[in-house]
Amino acid sequence: MKTISFNFNQFHQNEEQLKLQRDARISSNSVLELTKVVNGVPTWNSTGRALYAKPVQVWDSTTGNVASFETRFSFSIRQPFPRPHPADGLVFFIAPPNTQTGEGGGYFGIYNPLSPYPFVAVEFDTFRNTWDPQIPHIGIDVNSVISTKTVPFTLDNGGIANVVIKYDASTKILHVVLVFPSLGTIYTIADIVDLKQVLPESVNVGFSAATGDPSGKQRNATETHDILSWSFSASLPGTNEF
């Protein structure tokens, strides 16, 4: 059995186990800020990603076995400007190693229409693009930001959200639970995703987020995207330790 696990109860500056890309940074109060904040105010047209520094093997071409995994994290989205439209949201994603940050806005930094790469993602979308259903919503994304399945949720503005994402390799079901403790609300979504058909054997796992309107016409189309804690574990049958 090949296993990997890690746990960030909080984040430390100069954290060697994380790769920070574009505007992502770790604040002085140990929060992973995916998009830019200046003097406490989120900025527009910002994109950032944070990846676990080591690759994770999600399937084995020799045995055909696929890994099951579970990840838990807490996040907070603060929307100081309710008008016109806060944007855009954050995602947990799995993609091939060494991918470049994608387009911002509704592409969340994980998709580039001109040079796409395979990915699986769970989005927490706060802005309605032309391809989106009602907002905010949770979406399961496979190689596209047009989600295969969605469910709406009510955001606790500035509050803590707890997320559990589980993948069962035997059933190929990706299951997501979102909880806002202060509101007492729970949202769930699940879909079948065949990781072996979508992704290479080794991948990166992490987060990406973007604020809105690259044109700059609506500079209030923004919000914070903060990750407060993160754990991940995966097990791949029939192989040795990572």
Swiss-Prot record:
Keywords: Glycoprotein, Lectin
SUPFAM superfamilies the UniProt entry points to: Concanavalin A-like lectins/glucanases
InterPro entries linked to this entry: ConA-like_dom_sf, L-lectin, Lectin_legB_Mn/Ca_BS, Legume_lectin_dom, Leguminous_Lectin
Residues of this chain annotated as glycosylated in UniProt: 45, 220
A Pfam family matched in the record: Lectin_legB
UniProt key word Coiled coil: no
Example of a GO MF term: carbohydrate binding
Domain of life: Eukaryota
This protein's record includes keyword Glycoprotein: yes
Family label: Belongs to the leguminous lectin family.
Job description of the protein: Lectin.
Protein name (record): Basic agglutinin
Gene: WBAI
